[in-house]
Amino acid sequence: MSGEEEATVREPLDLIRLSLDERIYVKLRSDRELRGKLHAFDQHLNMILGDVEETITTVEIDDETYEEIVRTTKRTIEFLFVRGDGVILVSPPLRTAA
């Protein structure tokens, strides 16, 4: 199989397949975002990510002023299994034309 045939995108999961062993961005339910290296995935978007940076955003309302208070929490996780039913969006790395 030639390199061109391997890089062909015929269905959405092909784009994710091309991102194996590269850093991707994953947006999850509950205002969680992940950036990490994609090691494996399946048709349900279950994923195994390595060297993950998780960002959790919470919005609270101040009881006195009724202003929104936005808090962002970050943590680093060495290895993470992501269940596919919580995935909203997967973004492959940006590729530039050579």
UniProtKB/Swiss-Prot annotation:
Q: Which GO terms describe its cellular component?
A: Lsm1-7-Pat1 complex; Lsm2-8 complex; mitochondrion; nucleus; P-body; spliceosomal complex
One GO MF term, please?
Answer: RNA binding
The highest taxon in the source lineage is: Eukaryota
Tissues with expression = Expressed in roots, leaves, stems, flowers and siliques.
Where, subcellularly, is it found?
A: Cytoplasm; Nucleus
Modified-residue entries (N-acetylserine), positions: 2
* InterPro entries listed in its UniProt record: Lsm3, LSM_dom_sf, Sm, Sm-like_LSM3, Sm_dom_euk/arc
Q: Name one GO biological process term.
A: deadenylation-dependent decapping of nuclear-transcribed mRNA
Its annotated function is as follows: Component of LSM protein complexes, which are involved in RNA processing. Component of the cytoplasmic LSM1-LSM7 complex which is involved in mRNA degradation by promoting decapping and leading to accurate 5'-3' mRNA decay. The cytoplasmic LSM1-LSM7 complex regulates developmental gene expression by the decapping of specific development-related transcripts. Component of the nuclear LSM2-LSM8 complex which is involved splicing nuclear mRNAs.
Q: What is this protein called?
A: Sm-like protein LSM3B
Source species taxonomy:
Eukaryota, Viridiplantae, Streptophyta, Embryophyta, Tracheophyta
